[in-house]
UniProtKB/Swiss-Prot annotation:
InterPro entries with a match to the protein in the record: Cell_div_FtsQ/DivIB_C (IPR005548), DivIB (IPR026580), FtsQ_DivIB (IPR050487), POTRA (IPR034746), POTRA_FtsQ_type (IPR013685)
Domain annotation POTRA: ranges: 41-109
Membrane spanning stretches: 20-40
Family: Belongs to the FtsQ/DivIB family. DivIB subfamily.
Membrane topology: Single-pass type II membrane protein
Name this polypeptide is given: Cell division protein DivIB
Pfam families: FtsQ_DivIB_C (PF03799), POTRA_1 (PF08478)
Length: 249
């Protein structure tokens, strides 16, 4: 009799657990359906962060994200790929913030150099990535690259150039210049073992590319300390020892 009662109790507990499981499953189904159908979860706000070059409206337009779509129906990878089509975008992430907000966080590439070929100006970033081809670069404040021949290239990829020159392009941009009036205007890579960097009319003779960071910093210190910013001449840091400079009259 005792065993029979225990069996009945176990069966009741089992049925109760089954009913609870079914109830929870149905409740979850109802909640999911409501989330997918209720206007409460439709996209109302799309925010863009991290952009200084590309307008927020352009990024949103390129993403193909639409207000009014359900926030749970999004294929985030598709929208990321859409945004990454712009060569000025280096990286992007998209966050869903319940109930109705999308945050787009971008990291941009910055135009630093240009290569002139005929009537075209090839705009590249510090890593040698081709950002665009223009007919006019007025107001862009870019550094001219000499000694790199470029007739074509695929936008959004590295320019067809040897690895040593690509590395130098990156290293040159890492030099810290504290004087806002002193800016690199031209880099001559015509001869990889006889590099030259120009600050307006002041030529810095780098020589071989080894230790280019320290060489450039030494030259910058000389130009600033000797007040050579608006002068014409050269600073030679191609050898070991103190830099030498000479001015043209």
């Amino acid at each position: 009799m005792k065993e029979e009662n225990e069996y009945i109790v176990k069966r009741r507990k089992k049925r109760r657990r089954k009913r609870i499981t079914i109830f929870l499953f149905l409740l979850i189904c109802i909640l999911v359906t409501l989330c997918l159908k209720l206007p409460y979860f439709n996209i109302k706000y799309i925010n863009v962060e991290g952009n200084k070059i590309i307008k927020s409206d352009n990024i949103i337009e390129n993403s193909k994200l639409k207000k009014g779509n359900n926030i749970f129906y999004l294929n985030l990878n598709k929208y990321k790929d859409n945004i990454m089509q712009d060569p000025y975008i280096k990286n992007v992430s998209i966050r869903q913030k319940l109930p109705n907000t999308i945050d787009i966080i971008v990291k941009e590439r910055q135009a630093v150099f240009y290569i002139n070929s005929g009537e075209n100006y090839f705009i590249i970033d510090k890593n040698g990535v081709l950002l665009e081809i223009r007919k006019n670069i007025s107001g862009m404040n870019l550094i001219k690259l000499d000694g790199v021949t470029l007739k074509n290239g695929k936008i959004g990829t590295e320019i067809p150039c040897d690895s040593r020159r690509l590395e130098l392009i990156n290293q040159i941009t890492s030099v810290s210049i504290k004087d806002n009036n002193l800016k690199i205007t031209d880099v001559d890579m015509s001869h990889i073992l006889s590099l030259k960097v120009y600050f307006k009319n002041m030529c810095v003779v780098i020589g071989t590319p080894d230790d280019i960071y320290n060489k450039l910093n030494e030259a910058v210190n000389v130009i600033i300390s000797q007040k050579l910013i608006d002068k014409k001449g050269y600073v030679d840091v191609s050898f070991k020892g103190n830099p030498v400079y000479s001015l043209q009259q």
